[in-house]
Swiss-Prot record:
Species for this entry: Homo sapiens (Human)
Record-linked InterPro entries: Dpy-30_motif, DYDC-like_DD, Sdc1/DPY30
Superkingdom per UniProt: Eukaryota
Family according to the record: Belongs to the dpy-30 family.
Gene name, Swiss-Prot/TrEMBL: DYDC2
Cellular component per GO, a single term: Set1C/COMPASS complex
Protein name according to UniProt: DPY30 domain-containing protein 2
Length: 177
């Protein structure tokens, strides 16, 4: 019974201690055995602490590695969000620019349209716009069309401009041409 208890509690430790006592043959084997067991327990405790310390360090390393991975993933996600924001911003600015251009173009054409309408209603002004294809009013029949009708390519722009300017000039003034 004592042997089983010693084996179970001390196991290999006691067997090594007795082997060491038999090998050294000290003058006081019991005191030697006590010192040897004390030293064995001290080294076993140090080994256990080292093992726990290694486990703790490994856990810290794993957690810091996970934290670094999470940080990297967050940075990558932040970079993607920033890229998407820049892309959306570029799209919005291009849409804004195109909208502003459209508004500007519409604002630019409004004075021209008003001027054309104004000239159309002035007495003695020509409704022909130089450089633009002209349509014959539907009231004229095909046989009554003037044979001297010129295509837009054939119109002398200088003559057309002089004609328009002559109507706007006060009587008795000289033509700039």
């Amino acid at each position: 019974m004592e042997t089983n208890y010693l084996k179970r509690c001390f196991g290999n430790c006691l067997a090594q201690a007795l082997a060491e006592v038999a090998k050294v043959r000290p003058s006081d084997p019991i005191e030697y055995l006590a010192h040897w067991l004390y030293h064995y327990r001290k080294t076993a405790k140090a080994k256990e602490e080292n093992r726990e310390k290694k486990i703790h360090l490994q856990e810290e390393y794993d957690s810091s590695l996970k934290e670094m991975e999470m940080t990297e993933m967050l940075k990558q996600e932040e970079y993607q969000i920033q890229q998407n924001c820049e892309k959306c911003h570029k799209e919005l600015t291009s849409e804004t620019v195109s909208t502003k251009k459209t508004i500007f173009m519409q604002e630019d054409t409004n004075p021209l349209e008003k001027e054309a309408l104004k000239q159309e209603f002035l007495p003695g002004t020509s409704s022909l716009i130089p450089g633009m294809p002209q349509q014959v009013p539907p009231s004229e029949s095909a046989g009554q069309i003037d044979q001297n009708f010129k295509m837009p390519q054939e119109i002398n722009y200088k003559e057309a401009f002089q004609h328009e300017v002559a109507h706007e000039m006060p009587p008795g003034s000289k033509s700039p041409f």
